[in-house]
Amino acid sequence: MRILATDMDRTLLPNGHWPADEQAIELFNSMTREHDILVVYVTGRNQALTEAAVEEFGVRRPDILIGDVGTSIRKYENGGWRFDEGWTTHVREASPRWDAEAIKALVAGIEGLREQEAEHQNPFK
C-alpha cells in the first residue's frame, strides 16, 4: 500500500491571495487514483472546512483526515466519515489526566488568548 500524507493550506491548496493551480490539482487527483494511493490530509481544518476545500478546489476527498490540529482522525468509508476510535482510545489512555476545563482556567488570564468557536472544539482540544 502506498500512502501520501500532506497538509492542505499553502501546500496542496492556496490560502490567501494566490490562485489555485488547477492543472496541479487535476494531476494530483489522477495520479493518486491511478496508482491506488491512500491519501491523508493532515491539517488544522475540521471536517466541515476540509469538505469545503474539497468542494471549492476540486481536490479529491482524502481517505483519512487527521484534522483539528491533530486531535482527531477520521476515515472516509461507505460514503461517510467515521472517527477512528482507536486513536480516540489511545489519546484518552495516554493522557488520563487531560482536563480541558482545568487548562482553560489555567490560561484564562493570558491577554490576547482566546478559545476557538464551539464548532471547532472536541474533547482533546
Regions found by a protein language model. Give the residues of each.
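Membrane-targeting and insertion segments and their boundary/processing signals
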Residues: 2-5, 24, 39
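Conserved N-terminal helical subregion
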Residues: 17-29
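Extracytoplasmic ligand-binding site segments that recognize negatively charged/polar headgroups
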Residues: 121-125
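Active-site phosphate-binding/coordination module
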Residues: 26-118
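Asp-based phosphoryl-transfer active-site loop
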Residues: 1-18
